[in-house]
């Protein structure tokens, strides 16, 4: 799991390097999270994790505060999540997560990205079964057994725990995100998460043929340019 996770982080670093795009994506996600679960991070663990992630990605405090204030104001856009799946160059599998106020527009925009990169958008569930939908927490700790014990005491279902050079990475089903985070912060009050998120991790990878690489990069670039796109997951290796 760790390798796929690291590939994903490397992909983010390469493709989501425009600050304004990063701010916009976090702003929209924080707005939706605060609107759904409340604007108090102490009572909304998903929001707390999201704010911590945003700060680590150097999103300014005013961007975070504005999104929460907007959510608590009651008015504003009505964003809903949308997920699209398909096959890219070399038959790699791609999942695109969006937050949209116009699903028809967003579907058309995403489909256009696939079409113009010799790729094919598929039906819901066409590739998601080949990914694990995971909650992932990474942090510095010198005792793997203590982490496992904390998870067991809280009755959290853990998929995997990796320990390497003092870095512990806990993988759990996405539905266990809140319980796992609460268990970790309760057991280790000074915990500083290096990763705290929910992702789709591929169960197998697909090598991109050299001739297909330009089209794969075109697909990623076009999707990243869409305002409604929040996350892109794939199983490509290149």
UniProtKB/Swiss-Prot annotation:
Record protein name field: Probable transcriptional regulatory protein IL0164
Gene Ontology CC annotations of this record: cytosol
NCBIfam families documented for this protein: PRK12378.1 (NF009044)
Alphabetized UniProt keyword annotations: Cytoplasm, DNA-binding, Transcription, Transcription regulation
Predominant place of localization: cytoplasm
Chain ranges passing through the membrane: none
Entry's Gene Ontology molecular function annotations: DNA binding
SUPFAM superfamilies in the cross-refs: YebC-like
Localization: Cytoplasm
GO biological process terms on file: regulation of DNA-templated transcription
Keyword field contains Cytoplasm: yes
Family label: Belongs to the TACO1 family.
Keyword Transcription: yes
